[in-house]
Amino acid sequence: MTLEITAAMVKDLREKTNVGMMDCKKALQETGGDLEKAVDLLRQKGLAKAMKRAGKEASEGMVHAYIHAGGRIGVLIEVNCETDFAAKSEDFVEFVKNVAMQVAATNPLGIVPEDISQDVVERERAIYLAQAQESGKPQNILEKMVEGKMRKFFEESTLLQQSYVKDPDKTIQDYLNELTASIGEKIIIRRFARFQLGSE
């Protein structure tokens, strides 16, 4: 019997290593859900380079405010890193500003899929299932169609999975990984809030 890898386990490993969700899930599957072994495995693969300071908290960083489109859209974002030195680096500051612009442009529902309310996810799934059922295809094909549409939904509505607007060949997660590798510190997009004139 294989252990089910839960979203909470993946999120926990991701917060420890700052490695992408799929790599975290794969590492947990390969280590039977053992968090410490999964951390070691990611380090061996070179994915968790910033883990050489595993005990260090990402408590530095910056909060940035971005106002777009003549004052009609505003974003507040908090991005954390481990040291004040990194927080003041040009690359880090540019990253925070670029991610704030991304949020303004794309209006994500969360940073990772787990941030999106279950109600929203279930509603999307129900809509996609109803659409798929109209095709008259067998149940196993319907499930694959729905899974494909849900994957696309998360790619469009979660910040880390979105294509980066300034370089659509990579995701925000790729951009974050590149910065993590170049400054050698854990970086976490902690939270954001997007405001649009006239919307709730």
Swiss-Prot record:
Entry keyword set: Cytoplasm, Elongation factor, Protein biosynthesis
Positions of region (Involved in Mg(2+) ion dislocation from EF-Tu): 83-86
TM regions (residue ranges): none
Protein name as it appears in the record: Elongation factor Ts
Record has Protein biosynthesis as a keyword: yes
Record-linked NCBIfam families: tsf (TIGR00116)
Organism of derivation: Syntrophobacter fumaroxidans (strain DSM 10017 / MPOB)
Family per record: Belongs to the EF-Ts family.
HAMAP family according to UniProt: EF_Ts
Pfam families membership: EF_TS
Location (main, coarse): cytoplasm
One Gene Ontology molecular-function label: translation elongation factor activity
Cited CDD domains: UBA_EF-Ts (cd14275)
Function: Associates with the EF-Tu.GDP complex and induces the exchange of GDP to GTP. It remains bound to the aminoacyl-tRNA.EF-Tu.GTP complex up to the GTP hydrolysis stage on the ribosome.
GO cellular component terms attached to this protein's record: cytoplasm
Localization per Swiss-Prot or TrEMBL: Cytoplasm
InterPro entries xref list: EF-Ts_dimer_sf (IPR036402), Transl_elong_EFTs/EF1B (IPR001816), Transl_elong_EFTs/EF1B_dimer (IPR014039), Transl_elong_Ts_CS (IPR018101), UBA-like_sf (IPR009060)
